[in-house]
UniProtKB/Swiss-Prot annotation:
The gene is SOLD1. This is Secreted protein of Ly-6 domain 1. Its main location: secreted. Residues 1-22 form the signal peptide. Disulfide bonds join C25-C52, C28-C37, C44-C70, C74-C90, C91-C97. Keywords: Disulfide bond, Glycoprotein, Secreted, Signal. Residues 23-100 form the UPAR/Ly6 domain. CDD domains: TFP_LU_ECD_SP10_like. Expressed in placenta, where it is detected in both fetal tissues (cotyledon and intercotyledon) and maternal tissues (caruncle and intercaruncular endometrium) (at protein level). Expressed in the mesenchyme area of villi in the cotyledon (at protein level). In endometrium, expressed in the luminal epithelium and weakly in the subluminal stroma (at protein level). Detected in trophoblast mononucleate cells (TMCs) (at protein level). Also detected in trophoblast binucleate cells (BNCs). Overall, expression is strongest in fetal tissue and lower in maternal tissue. One of its GO terms (molecular function) is collagen binding. InterPro entries: LY6_UPA_recep-like.
Length: 100
């Protein structure tokens, strides 16, 4: 009886503490400028401290292609080159938050 109560207490506490839950993210190695996955898109589940990410590449000011998925290391940033901009976005607030 005491073991059952202890187990129940652990379950309740873990839900109250907001322990990380797996998050579903869009996954595609190449998304075209129209937002269509060209490489057979799917979804992935984050594990541990992973986040969903979205990388978009702009060439001469026009969206060219992108990449989306789950990543252990995701730092939101924009990298600039005279003709290319690479934009990284990270999210972990809702399922499928990395929509292209």
């Amino acid at each position: 009886m005491a073991k059952c109560l202890l187990l129940l207490l652990l379950v309740v506490l873990s839900s109250l503490l907001g322990l990380p839950q797996a998050l579903e993210c869009f996954q595609c190695n190449r998304v075209n400028a129209s937002g269509v996955c060209e490489t057979g898109g799917s979804t992935c589940q984050t594990q541990g401290s992973q986040q969903c990410f979205l990388r978009r590449i702009f060439e001469n000011g026009t969206l060219s292609y992108g990449h989306q998925g789950c990543s252990q290391l995701c730092i939101p940033m924009k990298l600039f080159n005279p003709s290319v901009i690479v934009e990284y976005k990270c999210c972990h607030d809702s399922p499928l938050c990395n929509k292209f």
